[in-house]
Amino acid sequence: IDQVMNEGRLGVAELKCREFLKKNPTHTYAMSQLSEIANRLGHFDDAELLLEKAVQFNPDDGELRMKYALVLRKKQKFAKTMEQVNILCDKYPDNLAYQAQKASEIMQNGQHEDAISLFDDILSKNPHNFSTFTSKGHALKTLGKTDDAIESYQSAYKIRPDHGEAFFSLANLKTYSFSNPEFMNMKEQIKRVDLSLRDKAYFHFALAQGYESNKQYDEAFFHLKNGNQIKRDQSKYSIERMDNELQAQIDVCNDEFFKNLDIGGNDTKDPIFILGLPRAGSTLIEQILASHSMIDGTLELPNILSLAQSLRGGDIYGKLGNYPKSMGSLSSDQRIDMGRKFIEDTQMHRGSAPMFTDKMPNNFRHIGLIH
């Protein structure tokens, strides 16, 4: 099965896994491999279910539980992800990979100072962990500690010069100027045939930013084009699918739809949703609102996206993937439950203010669900 998967013949590998599991229904490695196939095909609900059962059969397999946690994270179930990562860290306190994942989850929850402390603890034990330096840089950047973030990103690429994310992160600061040696390194790296496409895309985007800053616009567009081509080839994004999704929202969420709804939903005034297309100024609006003492700025919360995903997959409310049409068949109790769960799950991101912001850019795709 492993060989067939490595050859990319996922259909054959899936059949072999299923045949094997019919005879060995509790074989956790086979379940893990089948979940990997589902994961590669974008069937995250199936991957989650398989790994959940596998972990139940073999709760002491740390790597299996880590795979489960990462699938939960991919599905934006961050509370459940944190639960699994905590189990891993309790069971294997000396495993730095699990500690690093915990730090990333803490950072996801907005506890950046705590995350930095954990990153520093990891680096004290393994000072050559380049990815931890990069993650620490992200946390420092979020806290506005730009100079410290730069130092952390530079530490990452000094350990591994082909670590494209570190260079991209420096470029993404928008204020950083690459030195000549840094430029030379990036240009040499993208020539390598053995460089991963992920790193190569990062280098192209970093070079594009660097050339743009130097007013060398032809070179900047060249690298933007190449970086975006790599991302396009790897992406499952479809303009047609997006058009169909948005048209379905328009068709479903009309006047009649809302008039036919009875009572339901959570009537709390706590959340303030900042809706609009990405790069339309939502950050500025969030900062203005969050400057008020009665409003917590929580940045981009994933909860609405997770809720929409659950309705697509029949995960919680059993709507079998018919979103957004399925919203019309939700009972008032189900809508109240969804609102209650949103308030409870977002509590970890809030301070003590009575209201909070949610500026997740992709929430504009779910205006009907929010309403």
Which residues does each predicted region cover?
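Glycine-rich phosphate-binding loop used to anchor ATP phosphates in small-molecule kinases
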Residues: 337-369
